[in-house]
Amino acid sequence: MKVVCIILLFGIAAANVSATNKAGSSKNAKDTEGKKEILRFPRFIPNPKELATKLLDICKEHEKDSPSSYTAINDKHLDFKNCTFLCKHGPHKNVTLALPEETPCGPSGQTCADKSKCVGHIPGC
């Protein structure tokens, strides 16, 4: 009986190691394909990736003479009510810039061209 239990435990352990190796190899395959970016923009933004690219370009243009090669935006720091976004240049320099006038800022077709009609956080969205 002890021999059967020991063989069973080795079988379970071998299966777990095999499953772990398979999971690790699929993870590595995903990493080589590139990381999937998840943008958390409101639903009234029709193409989040396009907007993020445009904002990153604005951010880079603003600091084109900077020696730092690090430029980033953060979708959590977009203020659709005031039509601004946070641009990060390196670990210690942040700048608030204006969103382009054509940027949607509300669910009813509002744009940053008329900031008085823009809405902030929409409850339930």
Swiss-Prot record:
Induction: By feeding. By the presence of Borrelia burgdorferi. Pfam families: Salp15. It is found in: Secreted. One of its GO terms (cellular component) is extracellular region. Glycans are attached at residues 82, 94. InterPro entries: Salp15. Residues 106-125 are annotated as: CD4-binding. Residues 1-15 form the signal peptide. It comes from the Eukaryota. Expressed in salivary glands. Belongs to the salp15 family. Salivary tick protein that downregulates host immune system by binding to both dendritic cells, and CD4(+) T cells. Specifically binds to the CD4 coreceptor on T cells. This interaction prevents the activation of the Src kinase, Lck, and its downstream substrate Zap-70, and results in deficient activation of PLCgamma1, the repression of calcium fluxes triggered by T-cell antigen receptor (TCR) ligation, and a subsequent reduction in interleukin-2 production. This is Salivary protein 15 Ipac-1.
